[in-house]
C-alpha cells in the first residue's frame, strides 16, 4: 500500500 501523501510526514517523523 502506498499513500499519495507521506503518512510518516503526518506523524511528524520527517
From Swiss-Prot:
Record carries keyword Protease: yes
Keywords: Hydrolase, Protease, Pyrrolidone carboxylic acid, Thiol protease
Highest taxon of source: Eukaryota
GO molecular function: cysteine-type peptidase activity
Any one GO BP annotation for this protein: proteolysis
Modified residues (Pyrrolidone carboxylic acid): 1
EC number from the UniProt entry: 3.4.22.-
Protein family per UniProt: Belongs to the peptidase C1 family.
Protein name: Calotropin-DI
Species of the source: Calotropis gigantea
Top-level taxonomy: Eukaryota, Viridiplantae, Streptophyta, Embryophyta, Tracheophyta
Amino acid at each position: 500500500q502506498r499513500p499519495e501523501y507521506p503518512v510518516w510526514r503526518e506523524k511528524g517523523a520527517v
